[in-house]
């Protein structure tokens, strides 16, 4: 199973790239983690936010390979602790499809992305900076994998 993070935003600071790559490298070959960056729409004083969200959503959905399970990161989504995320990872593997996880921009996700989702996940009740979410996602997914593989990374 391949896990694909599709995130709005490009040209992240070096610390974000290094943090993400640190965890991406650790994934096993049979479960690679891939990052697809979508250009954020230009936001300004008189920006049409609804139109920007629509364009970002179209680009995100176009990046999802046909047949993939779509999981959105959204505040009202399911809240999983680490063992529950490990259970989700196992369920996704058994489903036989690759997984695309959509991370919206500053205004969140387009309605079309939410409508296309098979599942919605709330990473935290906190508002997190979008660059940091990439690292938190990579680490959380790696930790969940480590539980399923009985790897010593996760400790109770």
From Swiss-Prot:
It is found in: Cytoplasm. GO terms for cellular component: cytoplasm. It is an enzyme of class 2 (transferase). It comes from the Bacteria. The keyword Cell division does not apply. It holds the Pfam family SPOUT_MTase. Its EC number is 2.1.1.177. GO terms for molecular function: rRNA (pseudouridine-N3-)-methyltransferase activity. It catalyses: pseudouridine(1915) in 23S rRNA + S-adenosyl-L-methionine = N(3)-methylpseudouridine(1915) in 23S rRNA + S-adenosyl-L-homocysteine + H(+). Keywords: Cytoplasm, Methyltransferase, rRNA processing, S-adenosyl-L-methionine, Transferase. S-adenosyl-L-methionine binds at residues 73, 104, 123-128. Homodimer. Specifically methylates the pseudouridine at position 1915 (m3Psi1915) in 23S rRNA. Belongs to the RNA methyltransferase RlmH family. This is Ribosomal RNA large subunit methyltransferase H. It comes from Vibrio parahaemolyticus serotype O3:K6 (strain RIMD 2210633).
């Amino acid at each position: 199973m391949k896990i694909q993070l599709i995130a709005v935003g490009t040209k992240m600071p070096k610390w974000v790239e290094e943090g993400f790559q640190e965890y991406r490298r650790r994934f096993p070959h049979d479960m690679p983690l891939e990052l697809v960056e979508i250009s954020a729409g230009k936001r300004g004083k008189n920006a049409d936010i609804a139109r920007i969200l629509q364009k970002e959503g179209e680009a995100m959905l176009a990046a999802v390979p046909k047949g993939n399970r779509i999981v959105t990161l959204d505040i009202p989504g399911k809240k999983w602790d680490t063992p529950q995320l490990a259970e989700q990872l196992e369920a996704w593997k058994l489903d036989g499809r690759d997984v695309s996880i959509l991370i919206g921009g500053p205004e969140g996700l387009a309605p079309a992305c939410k409508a296309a989702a098979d599942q919605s996940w709330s990473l935290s009740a906190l508002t997190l900076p979008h660059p940091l979410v990439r690292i938190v996602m990579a680490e959380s997914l790696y930790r969940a994998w480590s539980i399923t593989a009985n790897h010593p990374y996760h400790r109770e």
